[in-house]
C-alpha cells in the first residue's frame, strides 16, 4: 500500500538584500528554516545572481557573492527592485527581463530544501515581502508559472501578515 505524503509548504521571506527559506509539513510542530550550508545556523541567502562569463551557468546567494570577487562572473543584484521597476538587465551579449532573473533566483532557493534531502517537491509557496504593492504583485503573478506553480499553490503576504 502506498504511503500518503504530507503536503510541503515553502515560505520565502525576500527583500533586495537577502532571502530566507523555511518549509513546513503537517506532521511538524513548527517550520524549519534552511541554511545553504548543512549544519550551519546562517539562514540569510544574498538576493544575488552571478553568471559565469561565456557560459550559461548561474550562481546564486553565497556562491554568487564568492564568485563576485573573481573576474569569472557578472553579478546582478537588487533583483526584487529591478523586477518591480520592469528593468531589462544586460549580461554579456544577452538581455534578460529582471523578473525572469528573480524567477531564476527563487527557483534555485526553492530547490534548496530538496537538494539538502529535507523535503520532496513543493506543494505550496508563500512569499513574504516587506510591503505588498500592485507592482510587486504583478511581478509575482508573472513569476508563479515559471516556478511551476498554479494560483492555488502560490500566495504573497507582507510582514504584517507573516
Model-found features: residue ranges?
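Surface-exposed acidic, glycine-flexible loop patches that form ligand/cofactor-binding
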Residues: 1-3, 115-120
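Short hinge/gating elements
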Residues: 63-64, 84-96, 122-125
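Phosphate/ATP-binding catalytic cores across multiple sugar-kinase/actin-like superfamilies
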Residues: 101-117, 162
Amino acid at each position: 500500500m502506498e504511503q500518503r505524503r504530507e503536503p510541503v509548504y515553502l515560505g520565502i521571506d525576500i527583500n533586495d538584500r537577502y532571502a530566507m527559506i523555511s518549509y513546513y509539513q503537517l506532521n511538524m510542530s513548527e517550520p524549519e528554516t534552511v541554511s545553504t550550508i548543512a549544519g550551519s545556523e546562517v539562514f540569510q541567502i544574498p538576493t544575488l545572481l552571478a553568471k559565469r562569463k561565456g557560459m550559461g551557468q548561474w550562481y546564486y546567494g553565497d556562491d554568487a557573492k564568492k564568485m563576485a570577487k573573481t573576474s569569472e562572473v557578472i553579478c546582478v543584484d537588487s533583483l526584487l527592485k529591478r523586477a518591480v521597476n520592469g528593468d531589462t538587465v544586460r549580461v554579456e551579449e544577452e538581455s534578460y527581463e529582471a523578473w525572469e532573473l528573480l524567477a531564476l533566483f527563487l527557483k534555485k532557493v526553492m530547490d534548496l530544501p530538496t537538494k539538502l534531502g529535507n523535503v520532496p517537491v513543493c506543494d505550496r509557496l508563500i512569499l513574504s515581502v516587506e510591503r505588498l504593492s500592485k507592482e510587486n504583485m504583478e511581478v509575482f503573478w508573472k513569476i508563479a508559472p515559471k516556478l511551476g506553480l498554479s494560483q492555488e499553490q502560490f500566495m504573497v503576504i507582507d510582514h504584517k501578515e507573516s
